[in-house]
Amino acid sequence: NYWRENYDLRYILERDWAKLGPRLEGKIHIYCGDMDNYYLNNAVYLMEEFLESTKEPYYNGEVDYGDRAEHCWNGDHTRPNAISRLRYNQMFIKKAVERMEKTAPSDADLKSWRY
């Protein structure tokens, strides 16, 4: 089926893990409310099941669920979704910088752009 072959991310990852896995190791981070308004949490459960089964390489990322949280939950367990939605930059820029520092080439400039 066309949709599955081209848009079902879990299916595509499972089908192509030998090729995609090494490129995505440590890069997959999924946050989902367990009461998603569109029931997307059900798809996330299936994705997590696949990711946890990966080997060579293991996906080495994270899947996190917000208890009673709705759509757009972003991983903040300390605040209600209506407030945490206002904090995307606060939360994810730090994670992006940590990833850049960890994976940057040895001669990369990691200081001049930080202020």
Predicted regions and their residues:
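Extracellular/periplasmic catalytic domains that process cell-envelope and extracellular macromolecules
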Residues: 21-24, 57
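Short, well-structured alpha-helical interface segments that form or flank functional binding sites
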Residues: 4, 8, 25, 42, ...
